[in-house]
Amino acid sequence: MIKVIFLDIDKTLIPSYDPEPAEPVIKELKRKGFEIVFNSSKTRAEQEFYREKLDVKTPFISENGSAIYIPKNYFPFEIKGRETKDYIVIELGVKVEEIRRELRKLEDAYGIKYYANSTKEEIMEFTGMPEELVPLAMEREYSETIFKWSRESWKRTLSERGFTVTMGSRFYSVHGNCDKGKAAKILLELYRRLGPVRSYAVGDGYNDFPMFDVVDRAFLIGNLTHEKAQNVSSIMEVLEVIE
């Protein structure tokens, strides 16, 4: 049996931006034989930072399901996707340039602040992010994060123009017609080509709900509720009940 666990990062795997608290979690999941898949709103560059720090070498899903990054030669069969130096990339979202074109049309009227029109100092203030991680977060490929706005109707306007607006732990994300669940389902289908799969997911936000819908067992950290997910206080509690 192949055991796959999809993990949100912010407020799920790590409480803040420091990867150190996640080290015992990753170590225990590896000991239990899990394939660990980060499924986060974070960019490829951000996730590569955490993958390196935590020694995780499995596929990962970036920017709210916008792209699946599969390390070359990870699966023993051919995968259709865009090839880079290190990955086969299955793209489900739209290019960030398309999103930013629309945001530029709206930013003044709606008072919108996002990565591309914010300074490094503003981003640090909005997010609490350490300065050294800001450049990684700014390497956006398929989405933008909305930090501030003056009029609520910006969400409806972008939705009417064909974009998806998703609420995360703290901010809104604007991306294409994709979500964490669609991407997780595609990746699970690839794993099933290797044999029977048992799937799990852990998250804390509304953007994790589509991911919960496609796995066998889901865990929700915090006070939100989802009909399929078991509420837990932390990811450490998850480790106590999964094998």
From Swiss-Prot:
InterPro entries: HAD-like_sf (IPR036412), HAD-SF-IIB-MPGP (IPR006381), HAD-SF_hydro_IIB (IPR006379), HAD_sf (IPR023214), MPG_Pase (IPR012815), MPG_Pase_thermophiles (IPR033980). It is found in: Cytoplasm. It comes from the Archaea. GO terms for molecular function: magnesium ion binding; mannosyl-3-phosphoglycerate phosphatase activity. The lineage of its organism: Archaea, Methanobacteriati, Methanobacteriota, Thermococci, Thermococcales. It is an enzyme of class 3 (hydrolase). Its EC number is 3.1.3.70. Pfam families: Hydrolase_3. Pathway: Carbohydrate biosynthesis; 2-(alpha-D-mannosyl)-D-glycerate biosynthesis; 2-(alpha-D-mannosyl)-D-glycerate from GDP-alpha-D-mannose (MPG route): step 2/2. The active site is at D8. It catalyses: 2-O-(alpha-D-mannosyl)-3-phosphoglycerate + H2O = (2R)-2-O-(alpha-D-mannosyl)-glycerate + phosphate. Keywords: Cytoplasm, Hydrolase, Magnesium, Metal-binding. Hydrolyzes mannosyl-3-phosphoglycerate (MPG) to form the osmolyte mannosylglycerate (MG). This is Mannosyl-3-phosphoglycerate phosphatase. Its cofactor is Mg(2+). Belongs to the HAD-like hydrolase superfamily. MPGP family. It comes from Pyrococcus abyssi (strain GE5 / Orsay).
